[in-house]
């Protein structure tokens, strides 16, 4: 995975690295705050490959360290925030939009395959 992460420098721009049973395996680098959003139909899994970030919810903040993961249940408003660059692996249905129910400058409608 480290080799694949070395192929891009952009933040909040998921890259597709594989597909399994209608789900995509994506790599993404976080840095700074993401947009508040919710995913109506999908739970989200955020395993940390390198670094650390915080998952913010309206009522709490959860630290996620390297080698750990967090699952965000569907319909839960959240946003990841990373003070420093963090490398995250995503496993999601192919139809999942990175900004969920929100359109923003960070929305990636057609992720690049690397």
Please tell me what each predicted stretch does.
Residues 1-26, 103-114:
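A short, N-terminal "cap"/entry segment at the start of jelly-roll beta-barrel domains
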Residues 22-24, 31-33, 51-54, 61, ...:
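Short, charged/polar surface micro-motifs in flexible loops or helix N-caps
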Residues 21, 49-50, 65-66, 84:
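A cytosolic small-molecule/anion-sensing beta-strand core signal
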Residues 29-31, 39-57:
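Short, conserved beta-strand element in jelly-roll/cupin
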Residues 16, 32-36:
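Short, charged beta-strand/loop "edge" motif centered at a coil->beta-strand transition
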Residues 58-76:
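Short acidic-glycine-tyrosine-enriched beta hairpin
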Residues 74-103:
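Ligand-binding loop in jelly-roll beta-barrel domains
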Residues 37-39, 78:
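Histidine-centered active-site/metal-ligand motif
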């Amino acid at each position: 995975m480290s080799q694949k992460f070395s192929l891009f420098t952009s933040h909040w721009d998921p890259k597709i690295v594989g597909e399994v049973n209608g789900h995509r395996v994506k790599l993404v680098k976080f840095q700074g705050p993401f947009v508040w959003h919710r995913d109506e139909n999908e739970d989200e899994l955020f395993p940390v490959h390198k670094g650390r970030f915080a998952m913010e919810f309206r009522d709490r903040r959860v630290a996620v360290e390297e080698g750990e993961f967090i699952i965000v249940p569907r319909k839960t408003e959240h946003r990841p925030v990373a003070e420093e660059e963090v490398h995250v692996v995503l496993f999601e249905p192919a139809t999942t939009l990175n900004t969920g129910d929100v359109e923003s400058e960070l929305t990636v409608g057609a992720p690049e395959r690397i």
